[in-house]
Regions:
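N-terminal interaction/assembly modules
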Residues: 1-59, 79, 87, 111-123
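Residue-level detector of well-ordered alpha-helical segments, enriched
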Residues: 7, 63-64, 95
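Charge-rich, solvent-exposed alpha-helical interaction surfaces
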Residues: 11, 84, 99-102
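Short, locally clustered residues in the helix-turn-helix/winged-helix DNA-binding domain
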Residues: 54, 69-73, 104
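Short amphipathic alpha helix immediately N-terminal
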Residues: 59-77
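Helix-turn-helix DNA-binding module
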Residues: 74-91
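DNA major-groove recognition helices of helix-turn-helix
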Residues: 92-110
């Protein structure tokens, strides 16, 4: 699972900030399949990212959306997130791995549903 999640972590560390800049610093969830340019593809991937984040579970037991937004995008430490939920450090690490896995699965489903090709694979 760690290797599988490495691709998602790298996506949020390296690609997501670049996509945000390419989008003109706008958060969008609009898919435009008519724009076949490379920028259009990246715009759609960025929209897919936010569609996926909005579909993530966000309950006290599985705060996946909170973990992805706060840790992967806003760079809040897992320790600070864990303190919010009054749990131990291992709880946070386990939830983070589950959140990354859930993100990858839902992201692939969203890409197929919205016909955004080629599929982005997290290795």
């Amino acid at each position: 699972m760690i290797k599988y999640n490495k691709g998602v972590r790298d996506f949020f560390k390296n690609d997501s900030p670049k996509l945000y800049l390419l989008s003109g610093s706008q958060i969008t969830t609009d898919i435009n399949l008519k724009d076949k340019s490379r920028i259009g593809y990246y715009w759609n991937i960025f929209a897919e990212t936010w569609l996926t984040i909005n579909r993530l579970e966000d309950t006290p037991q599985h705060p996946y959306r909170t973990i992805i937004v706060e840790h992967c995008i806003n760079h809040v430490t897992i320790k600070d997130i864990v303190n919010t939920y009054k749990h131990s450090g291992f709880w946070g690490t386990n939830r983070k791995n589950e959140a990354l896995k859930s993100f990858a699965e839902i992201f692939k489903q969203e890409q197929i549903k919205n016909k955004v090709y080629p599929l982005l694979e997290f290795e």
